Amino acid sequence: MKTTTLLLASVATLALALPAGAADPQLLVFDWAGFEEPGLFASYVEKHGQAPSYSFYGDDDEAFQKVASGFRADVAHPCSQMVSKYRDAGLIEPWDVSRIPEFANIDPEFLASPIFKDDAGVWYIPTDWGATAIAYNPDLVPADDVASLQVFLSPKYKGRTSLPDSSDDVWALAYLATGVTDWTVISEDQFKAAAAWLREAHKNVASYWADPAEMSQIMASGEVLVAWSWNDGVAYLQDDGYPVAFQREATEGSSSWFCGFINLKNGPGSEDKAYDFINSWLRPEAGPALLDAIGYGHTNAAAMALVSLEDRETAGLTEVNAPVLAQTPNDPAMRERQLAEFEQIKAGF
């Protein structure tokens, strides 16, 4: 793992939605803050002499709204459950996978949806994946307390928990906590039970974190003892020597997710350079670079083969003996309902 100070991580978040300077004006990548890692686009730089231009965001729905409102970029990096929104809005076009040699090495499980790949073409190139589970301070939180997701309701941790300001992640938590491990089909009763659980969990929340750097900071400060966290936030804390553990085997389980790149219609830059960029991302050497810099797994099986088991274990990316709710594409109408309900819950309603 790369040693990353919390200060530097927080500085990176200040670049949200701001284009990076001294970069190739012929390719604009709309991406999560922190993904402008040289190891991911090394072959692009070798070919073109400079890195792509970047514009950053911190939330999938925020990014979609910006693109839908007319923001122009060449490629964007949504997580899987957002792809249908971009397709339905007519904002993307298929990739020509004949121009992407490593496409053949992407683990098939990441493409197992007609939303990503159908008779019209390949609409999505999955690239990176991770886990969401319980991060906690083992010096102050007994392991027995985090054996269940109900720790987020415990009066013992009132004002000492944190949840992501991400509708998908909090609903994954709520569904798991109420016995649901597959969110592709959700009944009315399941939705209501999860919403009620979230309202109870909200009472314990000190803050909703916007990005892994923020989550790491509030845990490092001691303000928060238990958080529902992505694995990279845990890696930040580990690298900086703070006491943290990652519980992916709570009785009710944990969640997994993956993200990738879409080819935006009418991009302002070079289509050829968009393919050079995605080919750099998918080359096997990008696997260790991704894990080292950000803590995520790679969808290219050849890339993951270059990552040691020890590094996977440190990153929290090994197999677990517990349920896993995969954040695959779910019903768009239900997702919008969850988003609206989450905003109500955060507001105290």
Residue ranges of model-derived segments:
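Extracytoplasmic ligand-binding site segments that recognize negatively charged/polar headgroups
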Residues: H77-V83, R87-A206, A210-S216
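Early extracytoplasmic/lumenal segment of secretory-pathway proteins
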Residues: A23-Y86
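C-terminal capping/gating helix-and-loop segments adjacent to ligand/active sites or protein-protein/ligand interfaces
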Residues: P288-F349
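Periplasmic-binding protein-like
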Residues: F191-A201, D240-K265
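Paired acidic/hydrophobic, glycine-rich loop segments that form the ligand-binding mouth/hinge
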Residues: D74-P78, Y208, L225-W230
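Short helices/loops that flank or line small-molecule/ion binding pockets
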Residues: A42, A63-R72, D88-A89, V151, ...
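A bilobed periplasmic-binding-protein/Venus flytrap-type ligand-binding module shared by bacterial periplasmic
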Residues: A135-L140, Y175-A177, F258-S270, A289-A293
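A ligand-binding cleft/hinge motif common to bilobed small-molecule-binding domains
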Residues: M82-K85, A220, V226-P243
